[in-house]
A protein has these predicted regions:
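FabD-like malonyl-/acyl-CoA
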Residues: 4-127, 256-284
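Alpha/beta catalytic cores of group-transfer enzymes, especially the acyltransferase/condensing modules
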Residues: 22-26, 85-237
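A structural motif
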Residues: 67, 171-173, 254
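NAD(P)-dependent dehydrogenase/reductase Rossmann-like domain
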Residues: 158, 200, 239, 253, ...
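Short glycine-rich catalytic loops that host catalytic nucleophiles or stabilize transition states
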Residues: 178-181, 250, 283
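A short, acidic, amphipathic alpha-helical segment used as a generic capping/interface helix at domain edges
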Residues: 237-254
Length: 284
């Protein structure tokens, strides 16, 4: 049974999602169930849909209270905060909906993007960024996902400059692919959106989490509310340190990792660390 069917067949979850999303100006259940795909591709709708799906999966699978730490990649950090009872689900939905709108309006459509760079050493990634930024271009290290998996963000000309650098320097094993997102994330292009998001976050109540969370920009656990809130603001324009987050989990002998998000991306990245290969990696 696909996740859409699982959600629709569970009245408790449907009621929970409906209640939490009543302040949104669109039908969240209908969006998750029926799309359309064109609407789901817009980040202002994709973000609440992904958040809701992640929380729905956690509720359907009835994840117990034995979780010792929680973390979420990029948008997933909001799901982690909801799961840790640091942030009300309804507040999180409103936040990510507005976050998506701010991001969508910050960058003119088709002018910028995100580039996945595979099989390039981290030192070479930084060298490329330095070289590209020494010209009139600006490329940002959007997401440090895992060993050999880096994501860059910037204007189209900066993306092209990175591709040219790779070709000119004969990185034969290195492959690139564009991320299918309507706007780039975790980059300086979102500076204005960041200011608006900060204003909005200051109107929302955050509670001390019942489970420590590893924010994207810290890569280590915290239960400090101010630190958590500031991390949500900072991550919009700064690098997501996911590789370091996974490294923390492996070094601190986290033996079971449960992924409540859509797809297998998180677990596939976790498997790149030898220590985590031995962990129980469970996709819900």
């Amino acid at each position: 049974m696909c996740i859409r069917d699982s959600i629709n067949s569970n009245k408790e979850v449907v009621d929970y999602l409906s209640s939490a999303s009543k302040n949104l100006d669109f039908d969240l259940i209908e969006l998750i169930s029926s799309g359309p795909e064109e609407k789901l591709n817009l980040t202002e709708f994709a973000q609440p849909a992904i958040l809701a799906t992640s929380i729905a999966i956690a509720k359907i699978k009835n994840i117990n209270s034995e979780i010792s730490v929680t973390a979420g990649l990029s948008l997933g950090e909001y799901s982690a905060l909801v799961f840790a009872n640091c942030l009300e689900f309804s507040d999180a939905l409103k936040l990510v909906n507005v976050r998506g709108q701010l991001m969508q309006s910050a960058v003119p459509e088709g002018t910028a993007g995100m580039l996945v760079v595979l099989n390039m050493e981290l030192a070479d990634v930084y060298k490329m960024i330095e070289k590209v930024n020494s010209s009139e271009e600006e490329i940002n290290f959007s997401t440090d996902n895992a060993e050999g998996v880096s994501v860059l963000a910037g204007k189209n000309s900066s993306i092209d400059a990175c591709k040219k650098y790779i070709a000119d320097n004969d990185f034969r094993r290195v492959k690139t692919q564009m991320v299918q997102m309507s706007v780039p994330s975790h980059c300086s292009l979102l500076s204005e959106a960041q200011k608006e998001l900060e204003n909005l976050l200051n109107t929302v109540e955050f509670k001390v989490p019942e489970i420590p969370i590893i924010p994207n920009v810290l890569a280590k656990p915290t239960s400090d509310v101010d630190e958590i809130k500031n991390s949500l603001i900072t991550q919009l324009t700064n690098t997501v340190r996911w590789r370091e987050t996974l490294k923390y989990l492996s070094e601190n002998k986290i033996h079971h990792i449960i992924d409540a998000g859509p797809g297998k991306t998180i677990l596939n990245m976790a498997r790149k660390l030898k220590e985590l290969e031995k962990s129980s990696l469970l996709e819900l």
